[in-house]
């Protein structure tokens, strides 16, 4: 390793070279996160509900988390989205249009005991799911 009065250029070049060994840096620079992201880097996306699914929580929890399979409008990709709220799944029917967003897990991945579920439902037919669960709004008939 260079160390001396005039070693700055060598140190800088070495640092630039070895940064590529860092997986996070390499993925970020190559844009691999956006390439593999169904939402293509967007914060939210619209999709059509294909089916309701119950996903078992990981150990040590024992529950069936209510989720939906959604086909995105922008690219046709299918994702699973969690329905947050008590009885929220009852407000969502097949062929409804939903808005989904990231669920907020570490490094943009799954959260808590829900493996493989990276998204949550935010709106159903343009109405907030939280408002529907609270009873503050009614679901429009399409």
Curated annotation (Swiss-Prot):
Region named Disordered: 1-44
Annotated PANTHER family: 30S RIBOSOMAL PROTEIN S12 FAMILY MEMBER (PTHR11652)
Domain of life of the native organism: Archaea
Gene Ontology BP, a term: translation
CDD domains: Ribosomal_S23
MF terms (GO), sorted A to Z: rRNA binding; structural constituent of ribosome
NCBIfam families in UniProt: PRK04211.1 (NF003254), uS12_E_A (TIGR00982)
Bias type Basic residues, positions: 7-18
Composition-biased stretches (Basic and acidic residues): 19-38
One Pfam family here: Ribosom_S12_S23
Gene name, Swiss-Prot/TrEMBL: rps12
Species of provenance: Haloarcula marismortui (strain ATCC 43049 / DSM 3752 / JCM 8966 / VKM B-1809)
Record GO cellular component, one term: small ribosomal subunit
Family note: Belongs to the universal ribosomal protein uS12 family.
Role: With S4 and S5 plays an important role in translational accuracy. Located at the interface of the 30S and 50S subunits.
Subunit comment: Part of the 30S ribosomal subunit.
Name of the molecule in the record: Small ribosomal subunit protein uS12
Keywords on record: Ribonucleoprotein, Ribosomal protein, RNA-binding, rRNA-binding
Disulfide bonds: none
InterPro entries cross-referenced by the UniProt entry: NA-bd_OB-fold, Ribosomal_uS12, Ribosomal_uS12_arc, Ribosomal_uS12_euk/arc
Lineage: Archaea, Methanobacteriati, Methanobacteriota, Stenosarchaea group, Halobacteria
């Amino acid at each position: 390793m260079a160390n001396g009065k005039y070693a700055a250029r060598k140190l800088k070049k070495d640092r630039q070279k070895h940064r590529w060994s860092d997986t996070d840096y390499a993925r970020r620079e190559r844009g691999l996160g956006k390439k593999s992201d169904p939402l293509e880097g967007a914060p939210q996306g619209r999709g059509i509900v294909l089916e309701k699914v119950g996903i078992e929580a990981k150990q040590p929890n024992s529950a069936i988390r209510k989720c939906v399979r959604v086909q995105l409008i922008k690219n046709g990709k299918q994702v699973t989205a969690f329905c947050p709220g008590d009885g929220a799944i009852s407000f969502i029917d097949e062929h409804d249009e939903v808005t989904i967003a990231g669920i907020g897990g570490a490094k943009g991945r799954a959260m808590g005991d829900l493996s493989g579920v990276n998204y949550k439902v935010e709106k159903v037919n343009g109405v907030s799911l939280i408002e529907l669960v609270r009873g503050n709004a009614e679901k429009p008939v399409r």
